[in-house]
Amino acid sequence: MPRLTAKDFPQELLDYYDYYAHGKISKREFLNLAAKCGRRDDGISVV
């Protein structure tokens, strides 16, 4: 399986991670928001 890069994830998810990494939201908030991002086109869950 090829290594995933930032291009493989929705920008919205990357933005949520940025908020989490910089302490703007909690881990729980990040996971709740990330779960709403849905699935990738190939059916593999992003989170």
Swiss-Prot record:
Induction profile: Expressed during stationary phase (at protein level).
Superkingdom assignment: Bacteria
Name of the protein described by the UniProt record: Protein YqhI
Native species: Escherichia coli (strain K12)
